[in-house]
Amino acid sequence: IKLHNIIANISLKALQNDSINAAIKRLSVDEQSGFELRKLSLKVIANNKGMKIENFAIEMPGTEMKMDTIRMEYDSLKALNHFADNVRFSFRTLPSHVTLNDISAFVPALSNFKEKLDLNIDVEGTLNQLNCRTLEINAGDKFRLKGDVSLQDLSRPQDAYVYGHLTNLSANKEGIGFLVRNLSPHYNGVPPVLQHLGNTSFHGEISGYFTDLVMYGLFRTDIGSVQTDLKLSSDKAKALFSYSGGVKTTDFELGQLLGNKQLGKITFNLDVRGNHYKSQYPSITLKGLIASLEYSNYKYENITLD
């Protein structure tokens, strides 16, 4: 780590063996990897039983985040040696927006996300038993995420477990473009198959580890709905993304999705298993029943895949 352009204005009002009263009026710094902290300010009051952080605000090139009072509770100062399990805290964001590219020095995968997101979160618990009672992420009317999330063992990312209930995850046509544009390393426009979905939304649950997530719920689009019960897995060492589970739909407009006028609606209940290795064609296996498929103005029924 190499820091430069450091500007600091720190006020220490009181310091004793078991208490502190201090304020960071301004702290700004640049890091050689590209991270730029334009301003950090806060006031902290702490003793051997707890800590209170007020007026917390942080600014980066595309981020302005403010928080209500951050409160921490612990049995003694020794608890700080085991912060992840023994320090209970709570905080709530005030109106804030973030640009994920601002932290790409630490999370390179976010380097393409250069547009702002409005953020509203309300958190309580310990680092290893965290409950996010409110989670709202919006990009105007284009994209919305609303729900609540519980996280376990965040101090050990490889073992971290997440459970989330999504009451609203939605994107309109412009929102799909927003996501593709900010998540794609090489943006070449929105693929037609995604454009054809129209307005989309997902209501359901996610659970599992960051490398093995189960997604259960209903995915709605302008051309039909799909019920999903899928496990999504990733293996960076093998450059592999895989998925398996069940998908079913009734009268989904397959022809509109693929831009094929010969195809019409499809109804199916299938088990799917797919493997996607980097720089290779995907391998997909389907088993189950296609109850009906319209093709060239004729309906085919009861097609079994095994």
Where are these regions (language model features)?
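Conserved two-metal-ion catalytic palm core of "right-hand" nucleic acid polymerases
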Residues: 148-149, 232
